Structure formats: structure tokens, C-alpha cells
Amino acid sequence: TLCGAMTQDIDERAKINTSRSVSAMVAIGIINIITVPLIGKLGSQSAKTGYLLVAIIYGCIFAACHFFCFAKTKEQVIMPEKEKISIKVQLRAVMQNRPYILALIGQVLFGFTLYGRNADVLYYFTYVEGNASYYTTYSMCIIIPSIIGAACFQPVFRKLNNKGRTASIFALLTGISMLCMFFFNVKETPAAFYTLAGITQFFFSGFNTAIYAIIPDCVEYGEWKTGLRNDGFQYAFVSLGNKIGMAIGTALLAALLGKYGYVANQVQNPAVLSIMRHSFTTIPGVLWIVTAIVLFFYRLNKKRYNEIVEDLKKNRVK
């Protein structure tokens, strides 16, 4: 909810979300590189001790960053004072918020696709490619594209003036790139495989920035449409949608692997290998294209948003 309270300027919100995503990708890249060596250094006598100490260090850094953010950030948007509103009333309000509904559907698909594929990635490299260590190379290849992709959201948005359409384009290109990965593998075509992995991550990072940049603008639209401003509820509800997608995606993968005879640390049968391969490439690829189609219908562009903000300011003055 913090981004929506810091500014109502749609371009400033785009900058804030871009900075957040780029910083997150940089942090993820650093963590991916240093975590295993750090565990080995701190847990020279016991891996268990190493994991514990690294978790404590990361937890302290995480808490310190949150306290710093709390202390140094100011809310600039004046929130209307109102009495406590029931969940029923808030649900009725968000159901009238068409841009938000599209963003919510996008988040459910996002959670389903992203976490379902993430749950499959180690299975894919271990059993389909035959070597779990390939995952390390894969992780290294996607770090830089992740950072650049996140930074590219803002210039694409400036060109299109529509965050939903921007997210749609990134989702479409993510899906196409992921579908192309089906035709390559690490053993026979490593250069093409890792190149496509980087391209896929580039487009995904742009989408990841765009989808979260949409939500604050939906809050203003909802207030204009219904007279009710409920930042916290909308953020919580969209987060719930993402988690529901995550739960379904990961559970479905586990159920399919179990049904078709997956046995840990053994040679897998062709059906299981096929599930692992398609869950890494074609299935998420198709779902990303579906996500792109959904978000294509997001029509709250920059011009319309600015008109809504002006209406809200006039109404508050009255």
C-alpha cells in the first residue's frame, strides 16, 4: 500500500515500482551468488549451523531495511477519514472496479504460473537434463537479464501510457520465449537454451514490475467509481489471489507427478519426464499468453487516470 500513499502521479509510481523491482533483482542475484559459499564458511563443522546462521543474518538485514523504509518514507496522499467498513461492503466495491478485477485475475494466473514452474525447475534439471548442477548455471544466466528487464518497464510504459497493456506485452513475450525453450536443452544446444532462458527472464522481470505498478492506480479508480477508498483491502485481496494461484499451481504439479509414478532419486518413467519438461516450458508458456490476453483489456490509461485524480481532488475540496 505504500506506493499508493506516497504519490498520485502515475509516472512517479512507475519510477517507484521500477526502483523496487530493479533493487529486488540485484538483491536476488547477490543472494544467489553468495548464499552457498556463505553457508559453507559459517557452517564449516555443520551444514545445519551454516543454514541457521545465514538465515539469522538475512533476517536481521531484512528487518533493518524495513525499519529504515518506515523511518524515511512519508505518505503524501491524504486519506479520507471514515468509519470502519465491513468486508461485505469492500467486496461489493471491488467487484465494481473493472481494472482491479483484471489485475486480480492477472495475479492469480501469475501466482499459478510462476510458482508452479518454480516448483518444477529443480525436477527439470535433475531428471530431464540429468544434472542438478545445471540449475546453478541457469541461475547465473538470468541474473543480468532480470535487472535489465525490470528497468525496461518504465520506458515501455512511457511509450504505451497504459500499465496493463505494458504488462500484457511483457507477458506475451515471456510466453513465446518459454514456448521456444521446449525445442532446446542443455546437453545438445546449451547456448540456445541459456540464451532463451535469459530472454524469458528479461520479459518476465518487465511483467513483474508492471503487474504490481497497476494496483495503486486501481485504488484511485475504485474511489472515483464507488466513493470508497480501501488501499489495504485491495492490496491484501490481490495478494490473496496470488497466493491462491501459487497453492493451486504447486499442488497440481505435485499431484500429477505422484499420479504418474514419480519416485525421488530414481530414474523416472517417460510420463513423469514429460510432465516435468512441459511444466518448465509449454504449460507456463501458454498460461503467460492467457495472462497477456486478460491484461490487454485493461483500459485505465494515463490520460484517463489523470482525469480521475483531478475529479477526486475537486470532490475533496468540495
Task: Name each model feature, range by range.
Residues T1-Q8, G206-T226:
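Intracellular juxtamembrane helix-capping segments at the cytosolic ends
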Residues I148-R165:
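Helix-to-loop junctions at the C-terminal end of transmembrane segments
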Residues F112-G116, F202-A210:
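Hydrophobic transmembrane alpha-helices of Major Facilitator Superfamily
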Residues F183-A197, F207, Y212-A213:
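Helix-loop junctions at membrane interfaces in 12-TM secondary transporters
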Residues N17-L38, F62, S139-I143, F237-L257:
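Glycine-rich segments within core transmembrane alpha-helices of 12-TM secondary carriers
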Residues V54, N162-I169:
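Juxtamembrane helix-start motifs in multi-pass secondary transporters
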Residues L172-E188:
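C-terminal ends and interior cores of transmembrane alpha-helices
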Residues T1-A132, S279, P284-K318:
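Intracellular loop-helix junctions on the cytosolic face of multi-pass helical membrane proteins
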